[in-house]
Amino acid sequence: MITGGAYQEKKKYAVNYYGISENDMKNGKNCSISDLGNAKCIYNFQYLTKKYSIDDIKKAIFENPDIIIISDIIGEGIIPIEKSERIWRENTGKLCCWIAEKSVSVTRVSCGIGQIIKTTPVVFIRHGKTTGNLEKRYIGRTDEDLCETGKNELMKINYPECNNIVSSPLKRCIQSAEIIYPDKKIIIDENLRETDFGIFEGKNYSELCKNPDYRNWIDGKSEIPNGEISENFKKRCCNAFYNVMKNAYRKTAFIVHGGVIMAVFEKYGFPKKSFYDYQVSNGRGFIADFDGKYLKIREKI
């Protein structure tokens, strides 16, 4: 959500920050409720409350959670004499408060400069250690349990409280989530599983160092034979993260794999860093803020 006074270049800010064009925008003065359900962006949003009920507008927004809403602040200044204008102000104010609560981010724009006044907190935690991790093996699709060392280490770390818990479908992540957040419902997302290491699966460096396919892979010259293509893996993880976050307005924890964390932060992390700059140890991770475009790390776990 983007808000601010009239004539403060809120549209221009949306174009520059979110990379949308003015052709992607609908004007609340003349658009329909169906436009709200499928547009990328609505500006002059405040005028919709003159034409449609709050319940109908909320329903349309739920059907289009990716929408960017631009609304003037209309509750300031002289109180209107006309009762209908006062009711319009009141209804618009209540609706905008509801949208702000549900939004991933809220930005107030003045003179074309945006001040982010709300982000969504998010926590990333890499699963605890498995036997394969202790032996420094490539463990991707292999569905290992946590080892006792991994379980004990998780119980010693002080993790932040979270409202929503999302986990990879693999046992090492689910078991980690159950230890870290024992009283929370765990949501399983199949698209947050680790990559498939193909012919390298279950092996370690000493077993692979003389393999020419392995040398080519670590040198960035080729993909893993019979494994998941790197770009496909990254895209899968980032899409899964975004699909969760566009509906998550409360603090959300992702209990996932090291590769998943690196993939998501490579795309959304700010300032920009490379994939391997976001490596974390087992049981460790990041506390960050997501504003719909960037993940900004607040602290390390």
Residue ranges and their predicted role:
Residues M1-C31:
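Glycine-rich P-loop/Walker A and Walker A-like loops and their local beta1-loop-alpha1 context
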Residues D24-K26, C31-I70:
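Conserved nucleotide-sensing/catalytic segment adjacent to the nucleotide-binding pocket
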Residues I68, N163-P169, K251-I255:
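Short glycine-rich phosphate-binding loop at a beta-alpha junction
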Residues D56-F62, K94, T149-N163, Y242:
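A short, N-terminal amphipathic alpha-helix
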Residues P271-K296:
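Domain-level recognition of soluble alpha/beta enzyme cores
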Residues I180-R236:
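Phosphate-handling substructures
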Residues T120-K184:
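Active-site-proximal alpha-helix that buttresses catalytic centers in soluble enzyme cores
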